Amino acid sequence: MAELTPIIVIPARMQATRLPGKPLADIHGEPMIIHVWRRSVQAGLGPVVVACSEAEVFDAVHAHGGQAVMTDPDHPSGSDRVWEAVRKLDPEGRFDAIVNVQGDLPTLDPQIIRAVFAPLAEPGVDVATLVTEITNEEERTNPNVVKAVVGLRPGQRVGRALYFSRATVPANAGPHYHHIGLYAYRRDSLERFVSLPQGVLESREKLEQLRALENGMRIDCALVDTVPLGVDTPADLERARALLKA
């Protein structure tokens, strides 16, 4: 099978509820979105583009030498924004894999981006994502920590996702896995995904990835050792600034 040709797309929007203007939040003299863009470039997978809906984000990315594309401000999800950006940038289909990197991960290790792409080497995989083993008891029962049900044997680093939930699953003794919301898609799989109606379980759990499972799509999970810091609040922003302090 021919090797995939990926593009990295970073969806960014200014209307975050808990941290308005998040993409342009200053971290040591640069907007947060630039930190994410730079780390995505360092992953070395392919071109990197920011998918935004505000001119100020577009201008900031271009001012730092990056590429951005304007998208519809009313998309219901980041996946829809990513797909619009891909269609605009690459209508002829040169890129057959898309890596979706969240725009609020300024401390993201480029190796994590490479890790999420790797499972697509298996021909039957539609979507790839990441998990890490939960070691904190509070996280195990926290509904804001999404759990992935994946049967990883000892020493195994990639496994097939059977379900995602906010509940503590599976039952009984054994590891639980924290789902990390980075994704890599085959192009035709992303196109299909955004065309599907919202699923029953997706609506119930408020987890978009369940739409893929409800429609028979295969999601494989790569096991990584750390959870990247997502910046959702002013306190998170201060943590990111501290971590990135020169």
Curated annotation (Swiss-Prot):
Its EC number is 2.7.7.38. Activates KDO (a required 8-carbon sugar) for incorporation into bacterial lipopolysaccharide in Gram-negative bacteria. Its main location: cytoplasm. Disulfide bonds: none annotated. Pathway: Nucleotide-sugar biosynthesis; CMP-3-deoxy-D-manno-octulosonate biosynthesis; CMP-3-deoxy-D-manno-octulosonate from 3-deoxy-D-manno-octulosonate and CTP: step 1/1; Bacterial outer membrane biogenesis; lipopolysaccharide biosynthesis. Keywords: Cytoplasm, Lipopolysaccharide biosynthesis, Nucleotidyltransferase, Transferase. GO terms for cellular component: cytosol. PANTHER family: 3-DEOXY-MANNO-OCTULOSONATE CYTIDYLYLTRANSFERASE, 3-DEOXY-MANNO-OCTULOSONATE CYTIDYLYLTRANSFERASE, MITOCHONDRIAL. NCBIfam families: kdsB, PRK05450.1-1, PRK05450.1-5. GO terms for molecular function: 3-deoxy-manno-octulosonate cytidylyltransferase activity. One of its GO terms (biological process) is lipopolysaccharide biosynthetic process. InterPro entries: Cytidylyl_trans, KdsB, Nucleotide-diphossugar_trans. This is 3-deoxy-manno-octulosonate cytidylyltransferase. It catalyses: 3-deoxy-alpha-D-manno-oct-2-ulosonate + CTP = CMP-3-deoxy-beta-D-manno-octulosonate + diphosphate. It is found in: Cytoplasm. Signal peptide: none annotated. Gene3D superfamilies: Spore Coat Polysaccharide Biosynthesis Protein SpsA, Chain A (3.90.550.10).
